[in-house]
């Protein structure tokens, strides 16, 4: 992964974070489990609290949409904002000044609010220190919710391939099982190779390996999933 530039790492891990947020939002049971687990880390771990309900949530949508190539026009962010608008319309009048207004909400609405807010708290932006790239904190969550990046993102020259070196574009085509397309790209200039890759990747499910959760070592068949879908 270290061959991927830090700016591209930031851009694509931001894109990935928004996509996982949108996917988690659609699975309230998994979102609630994540919330409970996160709270238990504090409750059953070390440390004591002198104030009730010391819970905090930080939504990173501003920085995520600033860094992600799709910005505010991406499918994931638009889905998140559509759900936010739907839920905002269900909030009781004066809710921000009086907690008891939430007592009138149905369990269904409360669950939707918990699920959405938990999803918005995700932050999977990766960093690089001393030449070592941090592991994505989204890996195990993605596996739990059956997440696939291509449900929310389409690789293009503008949002991905154009930021790669020519040999990385060729490697991506080979990784996707498109050896003939990779061979043709060898003879092209970088810009043409990026467009070439966009065209040949448009109908498959390929995702850069470094943007995916690690596959179980015992499952050799899943490791060829990209190639099988690209064939």
Describe the predicted segments one by one.
Residues 197:
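Segments that shape or occlude catalytic/ligand-binding pockets
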Residues 1-190, 201, 209-231:
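C-terminal helical accessory/scaffold domains
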